[in-house]
């Protein structure tokens, strides 16, 4: 309980109520394993995410600040859609869905571009969008998405494979400067195949009451330190 005495700053008082409202705005637990997690650096992390969909482990509540970051990303994604439409790009609808393994593995892409200005790209193509801070934005501009994030890289290849698309336009919004960066990525079907095999291993192991290997034998490893399932994994 926040102590609303005269020394409490107005920022803390107002944010207390905002954070409380966001915390109470509980989202329904996801009932499927999403494409955004299958490229995680640890296969056991993927398994725990799957187990959470079955109610076998508890997910940690989302921090209100993180919820605001998610909301910001959704706002910028919608604006990017509007900007592209203004520039003459045409959409084949939004939030196209795929599912596999009896709906255990599923996902929704941001959109599919079906036509647009003559700018050297071929349609149709998957469209995905991310809003990143300046550091992440510059890293993608410099080295490309593949080097920046395995999770994002695997996610778009899963979408392309299941939605039968051969390429993706990946748009990144710089949250600090509002710069835009676009990268065209061709489908590598092997990436999607390995992701599906990973999902299959996780499902099979869970049904057998087994745990897939961790990415490390050191619980102080940086990936473990930021994993919400670390306490369950190492107990």
Task: Walk through the language-model features, giving the residues of each.
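Active-site-adjacent loop/helix micro-motif of nuclease/hydrolase catalytic cores
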Residues: 135-141
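Metal-dependent nuclease catalytic cores that hydrolyze phosphodiester bonds in DNA/RNA
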Residues: 1-126, 133-135, 146
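A structural signal for short, well-ordered beta-strand segments and their strand-loop junctions
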Residues: 92-93, 126-128, 167-172
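Basic side chains
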Residues: 44, 130, 196-198
């Amino acid at each position: 309980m926040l102590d609303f005495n005269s020394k409490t700053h107005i920022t803390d008082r107002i944010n207390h109520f905002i954070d409380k409202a966001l915390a109470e705005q509980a989202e329904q637990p996801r009932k499927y394993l999403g494409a955004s997690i299958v490229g995680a650096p640890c296969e056991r992390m993927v398994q725990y995410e799957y187990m959470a969909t079955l109610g076998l482990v508890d997910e940690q509540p989302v921090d209100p600040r993180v919820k605001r970051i998610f909301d910001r990303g959704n706002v910028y994604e919608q604006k990017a859609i509007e900007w592209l439409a203004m520039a003459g790009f045409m959409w084949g609808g939004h939030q196209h869905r795929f599912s596999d393994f009896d709906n255990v593995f599923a996902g929704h892409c941001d959109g599919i571009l079906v036509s647009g200005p003559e700018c050297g790209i071929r349609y149709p193509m998957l469209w995905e969008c991310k809003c990143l801070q300046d550091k992440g934005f510059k890293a993608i501009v410099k080295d490309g998405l593949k080097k920046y994030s395995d999770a994002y890289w695997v996610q778009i290849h899963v979408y392309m494979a299941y939605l039968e698309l051969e390429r993706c336009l990946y748009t990144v919004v710089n949250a600090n400067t509002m710069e835009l960066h676009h990268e065209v990525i061709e489908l590598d079907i092997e990436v999607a195949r390995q992701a599906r095999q990973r999902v299959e291993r996780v499902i099979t192991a869970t049904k057998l009451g087994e745990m897939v290997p961790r990415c490390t034998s050191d619980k102080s490893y940086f990936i473990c330190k930021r994993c919400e399932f670390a306490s369950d994994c190492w107990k």
